[in-house]
Amino acid sequence: MQVRIVSLAAQPLFVLRVQGPFAQSLGPGFERLMAWSARHGLRGQWMALYYDNPREVAPDALRADVALTTASVTLPSDGEAYGIRRGALAGGLYALAQVRVTDNDFATPWIALFDQALPACGYRPDGGPCFERYLSDGRGSGEWLLELGVPVRKN
């Protein structure tokens, strides 16, 4: 796995909070956000932001935001009724890795990033939310191209 360390600017988002096991909570969250954004003609990149470590937090308590990047300053009027709010991916130093997911196995690349790739490049997580940026749509095939992002600091 190749990791790049880059400084990212803050990215405004429309987000919908989900809670529970990631494999069960993210799909319905994305469906809801996609339906809402389609009604408003919104376009952007799809992301998931992860706030909890599944090695440390019980599955039912895991929190994530499904997100759509936006340049809009205003949340459409029905956003809050759908549980959608404005948010942001914080700017700062990130470790980025482009990975391919097969059979919807999202855990394996994350484990490799945290257990092998980050220690090897001399950086450690900085405590902020990690993210996935979806570069392809694998809903039908289980095959995904993703960018994984972890806020980091030098060891």
From Swiss-Prot:
Please tell me whether the keyword S-adenosyl-L-methionine is annotated for this protein. no
Q: Which UniProt keywords apply?
A: Cytoplasm, Stress response
Any idea what job this protein has?
Answer: Inhibits the supercoiling activity of DNA gyrase. Acts by inhibiting DNA gyrase at an early step, prior to (or at the step of) binding of DNA by the gyrase. It protects cells against toxins that target DNA gyrase, by inhibiting activity of these toxins and reducing the formation of lethal double-strand breaks in the cell.
Any one GO molecular function term = DNA topoisomerase type II (double strand cut, ATP-hydrolyzing) inhibitor activity
GO CC annotation: cytoplasm
Cell location: Cytoplasm
Per the record, the similarity remark reads: Belongs to the DNA gyrase inhibitor family.
| Species whose genome carries this gene | Edwardsiella ictaluri (strain 93-146)
Task: State how it assembles.
Answer: Interacts with DNA gyrase.
Q: What residue ranges carry the coiled-coil annotation?
A: none
Mind telling me which InterPro entries this protein's record contains?
A: AraC_E-bd (IPR010499), DNA_gyrase_inhibitor (IPR050908), DNA_gyrase_inhibitor_GyrI (IPR024911), GyrI-like (IPR029442), Reg_factor_effector_dom_sf (IPR011256)
Would you tell me the protein name for this molecule?
DNA gyrase inhibitor
- Entry-linked Pfam families: GyrI-like
Please tell me where this protein is predominantly located: cytoplasm
User: Does this entry carry the keyword Cytoplasm?
Assistant: yes
